[in-house]
From Swiss-Prot:
Single GO biological process annotation from the record: protein stabilization
Protein's name in the database: T-complex protein 1 subunit eta
GO molecular function: ATP binding; ATP hydrolysis activity; ATP-dependent protein folding chaperone; unfolded protein binding
Main EC class the enzyme belongs to: hydrolase
Location(s), subcellular: Cytoplasm
Domain of life per record: Eukaryota
Gene that produces this protein: CCT7
GO cellular component: chaperonin-containing T-complex; microtubule
Binding annotation for ADP: G41, G93, T94, T95, S96, S164, S165, G409, E494, R499
Length: 543
């Protein structure tokens, strides 16, 4: 008699286990790597991605591309997550980390198919990663922070390496200098929020500028603003979160009046409340008034008559950056506008940039903030420029905090590959094969750099292996001359932190995917999702 089958899972649940599902997961990760493979390095190509709403994005950044791809495969999502975490943590190396993770999996795939236990693979990978990280720390070159000129040179080289694979690589020297200037203006915490990036269409890339202070787009203004002065020297700046306009009552207010005089008294009281606020602001000595909330036409004309400048509906982020630069604090009431709460700057002016008008605060006493104003043609191009600058800024921040650098262009990967290959020959058993596979996987970076530039990858990798075997630690791919070169001498530098982070994240992701022995897909997530989406809409009561 047949035993009754026990049904644990809901009908329609898709469950796959054993070696076939693990191989399937590894193959899914290869597909993700294929999507970003060609974007690596200075000769990398760009991707044009159009989302569901028809918005086009041109990008070369691994994390941006993977975010825009709607990945549904659960194992492949792991690679998307490590690219995002690399972007958040160090800013650059997002394509490298995805390629490394996929290549690690590709190298262990034959061992998995032969039935090697995943735990043996994981143990070997953890050993190899630890050895590789220690080796990077050992050979990384430290630049002394005391020597400001040397440190600045190092930071510019790191920024140029980060920008060399981007759309704006032709202007990398121009932007690298701007990026280093920007990060140097920040305080010791190096808060990214304190660097504003504003995009103005039109003009050439070289028209982009860095403002040592705050700049933001002119807000919507009411009639009367054209009478206000557009430039002040040493003004006091009032930063408010107060509405300065007459408005209908927000709540259900009810006023009962019996005579015309009663009504007039109410109207007068409303006007008096507004004028009282305006007078207090005027008497505080402030010449520039910024508010997060609207400043109406009456207030605009009142300030114009008294040679004051005002701007309402200023974005909160810009208001906070103005406060950080000019000092003072944001007030929610006008009753205590003393000198302590007002900000100051040397020059405030409103300037035309392209087709837009911008408000500039420069010469700020606490200038721990700055603003990039980017110029350029197409909107997508400027968005990609912003992403490229973000990567370069993150790299420079990392280089300031961790002042050790390694050579890029596949040099560090080749050195680690040689080191791990040599190490693997000293140990017996399966670990030897697996650490050898890890070492081979590291060669994907220089190989892909060659492929993307159209070089003969096999030939160049043979030269690199030979040179590293002779002790040429920093030899990597020379993109300009289709050969190998000492990339440290060529100033292809990047913070050691970027490589350490990429290796550990890629190795962890590979271990995570190898350690999964069963994939269970719940049917609810696929069947019920579209139905649930329409549920929240009100359909009105049937009459």
């Amino acid at each position: 008699m047949m035993p009754t089958p026990v049904i644990l899972l809901k009908e329609g649940t898709d469950s796959s286990q054993g070696i076939p599902q693990l191989v399937s997961n590894i193959s899914a990760c290869q597909v993700i790597a294929e999507a970003v493979r060609t974007t690596l390095g200075p000769r990398g190509m760009d991707k044009l991605i159009v989302d569901g709403r028809g918005k086009a994005t041109i990008s070369n950044d691994g994390a941006t591309i993977l975010k825009l791809l709607d990945v549904v495969h659960p194992a492949a999502k792991t690679l998307v997550d490590i690219a995002k975490s690399q972007d958040a943590e160090v800013g650059d190396g997002t394509t490298s980390v995805t390629l490394l993770a996929a290549e690690f999996l590709k190298q262990v795939k034959p061992y998995v198919e032969e039935g090697l236990h995943p735990q043996i693979i994981i143990r070997a990978f953890r050993t190899a990663t630890q050895l590789a990280v220690n080796k990077i720390k050992e050979i990384a070159v430290t630049v002394k922070k005391a020597d400001k000129v040397e440190q600045r040179k190092l930071l510019e080289k790191c920024a140029m390496t980060a920008l060399s694979s981007k759309l704006i690589s032709q202007q990398k020297a121009f932007f690298a200098k701007m990026v280093v200037d920007a990060v140097m203006m920040l305080d010791d915490l190096l808060q990214l929020k304190m660097i504003g990036i504003k995009k103005v269409q039109g003009g050439a890339l070289e028209d982009s500028q860095l403002v040592a202070g705050v700049a933001f787009k002119k807000t919507f203004s009411y009639a009367g603003f054209e009478m206000q002065p557009k430039k002040y020297h040493n003004p006091k700046v009032a930063l408010l979160n107060v509405e300065l306009e007459l408005k209908a009552e927000k709540d259900n207010a009810e006023i009962r009046v019996h005579t015309v005089e009663d009504y007039q008294a109410i109207v007068d009281a409303e006007w008096n409340i507004l004028y009282d606020k305006l007078e207090k602001i005027h008497h505080s000595g402030a010449k520039v008034v910024l508010s997060k909330l609207p400043i109406g036409d009456v207030a605009t004309q009142y300030f114009a008559d008294r040679d004051m400048f005002c701007a309402g509906r200023v974005p909160e982020e810009d208001l906070k950056r103005t406060m950080m630069a000019c000092g003072g604090s944001i007030q929610t009431s006008v009753n205590a506008l003393s000198a302590d709460v007002l900000g100051r700057c040397q020059v405030f002016e409103e300037t035309q940039i392209g087709g837009e008008r911008y408000n500039f605060f420069t010469g700020c006493p606490k200038a721990k903030t700055c603003t990039f104003i980017l110029r350029g043609g197409a909107e997508q191009f400027m968005e990609e420029t912003e992403r490229s600058l973000h990567d370069a800024i993150m790299i420079v921040r990392r280089a300031i905090k961790n002042d050790s650098v390694v050579a890029g262009g596949g040099a560090i990967e080749m050195e680690l590959s040689k080191y791990l290959r040599d190490y693997s020959r000293t140990i017996p058993g399966k670990q030897q094969l697996l650490i050898g596979a890890y070492a081979k996987a590291l060669e994907i970076i220089p190989r892909q750099l060659c492929d993307n530039a159209g070089f003969d990858a096999t030939n160049i990798l043979n030269k690199l292996r030979a040179r590293h075997a002779q002790g040429g630690t920093w030899y990597g791919v020379d993109i300009n001359n289709e050969d190998i070169a000492d990339n440290f001498e060529a100033f292809v530098w990047e913070p050691a932190m970027v490589r350490i982070n990429a290796l550990t994240a890629a190795s962890e992701a590979a271990c995570l995917i190898v350690s999964v022995d069963e994939t269970i897909k719940n049917p609810r997530s696929t069947v019920d999702a579209p139905a649930a989406a329409g549920r929240g809409r009100g359909r009105g009561r049937p009459h």
